[in-house]
Amino acid sequence: MRMSKALAAVVAISVSLSAAAMGVDATVESTCSDAAASDKRVHLAMCLSQLGHHRDADAWGLAKAATLVGVDKADLAADDIKELEAGASTAGIKPALAECAKQYRGVGFAFASAHDVINNRAYDVGEKKLDEALSLTQKCNAAFAKIGVPLQQPLAQLTADTIQIAIIAKAITCLVNVNNNPALVAAAAAAAAAKAPQQSQYP
């Protein structure tokens, strides 16, 4: 169902007020809003909260910043896994924890690699690295689902956050990629024009 113009205006105002309350720079606000519009999986509030302090960054800088948030989330998850593995009551889930530990090593590396290639403006490669980070993180969820046990906190929240930041980072990287590729810009403009309602040539 298409959002009415009035409702869309209310949503836009709400986002602006929320961003202002957090002290978010206008570039961060617009980039996160564009990312959320381009990929419905993007959680706008998380994008604003995680990237809002990067006041001087353009979209390219925000894409790189998001990958570093991903590295940090992966490191925190790895530390939490070690603590869970050391617990006396986790014998039944230790194989799943071992699988998560293995996957999160790859997650951190994928985010770090994404940062490096995005910094070199190899956006397509960066998008693939972020897909890899997302896939590896989801394998931790799958390891616990296989034994029918939910992830314990705070690992569950860290995993959800890592998945979300991979989605956010890729969405922003895609925006930068499109904006820096004349052919993609032209294709996007043509697609938007094709979707726009046609005005009659008659009064």
Curated annotation (Swiss-Prot):
Per the UniProt entry, the disulfide pairs are: 32-47, 100-140
Q: Where is the signal peptide?
A: 1-26
**Record has Disulfide bond as a keyword:** yes
In terms of InterPro entries, this protein maps to: Invertase/methylesterase_inhib, Pectinesterase_inhib_dom
Cellular location(s):
Secreted, Extracellular space, Apoplast
Identify the GO cellular component terms for this protein.
apoplast; plasma membrane
Q: What induces or represses expression of this protein, per its UniProt record?
A: Induced by drought stress.
Answer whether the UniProt record assigns the keyword Signal to this protein: yes
What GO terms are given for molecular function? pectinesterase inhibitor activity
The alphabetical list of record keywords is: Apoplast, Disulfide bond, Secreted, Signal
Task: Name the SUPFAM superfamilies for this protein.
Answer: Plant invertase/pectin methylesterase inhibitor (SSF101148)
Q: What is this protein's function per UniProt? A: Pectin methylesterase (PME) inhibitor that inhibits PME in vitro.
Q: Which family does it belong to?
A: Belongs to the PMEI family.
* Protein's UniProt name: Pectinesterase inhibitor 12
Q: What is the lineage of its organism?
A: Eukaryota, Viridiplantae, Streptophyta, Embryophyta, Tracheophyta
